Amino acid sequence: MPAWVLGSLRGYRRSWWRRDLVAGLTVWAVLIPESLAYASIAGVSPVVGLYAAIPALLLYPVIGSSRHLVVGPMSATAALSAGVVGGIVSNDSGDFPAYTAGLALAVGTLAVLAGLLRLGFLANFISEPVLKGFIVGMALVIIVGQLPKLLGIEGGDGDFFQKLWAVVASLGDVSGWSALVGLGCLALVLVLRRTAPLVPGSLVAVALGIMLAAVLDLEDRGVEVVGHIDAGLPAPGVPDLTAASDIPLLLSGAAGVMLVGFAEGLGAAKTYARRDGYRIDADRELAGLGAANLGAGLLDGMVVNGSLSKTAVNAGAGARSQVSGWTVAALTVLTLLVLTPLFASLPEPALAAVVIAAVIELVDIGGLRRLYDVNTAALTTIYGRAARADFICALGALLGVLFFDTLPGLLIGVVLSVVLLLARTAHPHVAVLGRVAGGAGQWVDVERDPGSSPVSGVVVVRVESGLYFANADAVQDRLLELATADGVRALVLDAATVPSVDVTAAGMLRDVAAELDARGVRLLAVGDVGQVRDVLRRTGAGAVLDRLYPTVEAAVAATSPGEGEAAGDGAARR
């Protein structure tokens, strides 16, 4: 058996089982109502969330590397699922549940393949600011989408703003009983979260809603209920898709869903691995996510991924291994076998309240404000509008979700982050350095430390970026501008801060050296990085290395009248 199979359970101790059992029971109390709620976000019957949770909890530990991660339906991927499937078949179509399960299979297939190909680094392409903006936008869309159920009114179609306007326009038709149940359950969950965080508020709200439905006969009073749910487990099988031509559409949407789910789950797994001193294998996490989704799809479920909130509950309750996850799976099976008749009378407003309570804390306006405040006047001077790249990316993803739906919003954020990264690296800061008085050879940016002193006739510069084709011209223009000013006899380039160089940039350095030589200005370099040295030599720009010095002080000293270039020849060659 491969070493990675059940790797998260290796070293299991018998003394752990009590903690794992208690943690599993605690997570079950949170997972049941949230899975019901997230299934409604995905546009399918609430019980589909339970169908998906069971194989996810059973299969992830077989491959995954986290001892604590809880895998199941989540709000972000549920919203993405609704968007992807809704773009293929109508929300009212009888095929919607099958396509939802088909999307889980597509996500699982892609994730397993990506894990086998060791593509775990893909999560790095969704930056934290993009994910922040996406999640805030998604949470707002979910909340507005649940308001009609919460208040017992007709909802609207379209983007976030069209749905919001439909809610506002229908406020005169609010159902009193629906609003009372929905708002009451919402208030209950939020109050319990603040005053009694150990109490599973969502489960309490669901139980209260079921009790009120029975005692007050809410269905006869016009309150919508979940309705009949078949008891037991569905038979495993491949979803019946009506058209094979829809499979490419599912696969294309599955790529974005997989990335979001993987990024969210990987972050949760790493958080608790750091706390307990073990390592997470990103490729195994991808494959584990894939196995969980394949199982969910084959059991008529929906897309699943790792949950930070439920993982926190799991770890906080003392879980030591994935035995806690298997405990949750067993309890969920028991729930489907015995308790499903109770969920039939669950009021839709109570379920909407659980959904809203679950996502309302994701509307992190303070986090967006912190991204905005990261910018400084100095950064604005250097990068212009691109100085607020993180905030712009988050805002782009947020607005993209609100105007164009979830997956397009995510893509907008990713594209913006790449464009702004290129914009910043295409015009890197070329700092002019000055000597710090009494600093024992310390050189700093004169713009940031006015007390530093430039050397007369010598310009010392530091390029704060790697050099490549996109910024070669900008750096060349800046170097020549500084080196050809009146009275300059030498340009010292601190190359220790240049981590990489490509062929285009190497040619640029060769051209700069030649032009400065023709003008009688010496070009000297300080320090180097091995890969930079190799590229310069292999591209014919090795002459720059013949003027290489170990320190800025040594290079500046070599520019003094009477000092020859030979003073630096080979001084820093390695």
Name the predicted role of every residue range.
Residues 1-440, 447, 455, 471, ...:
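Transmembrane helical cores of multi-pass ion-transport proteins
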Residues 433-574:
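Structured cytosolic domains appended to multi-pass membrane proteins
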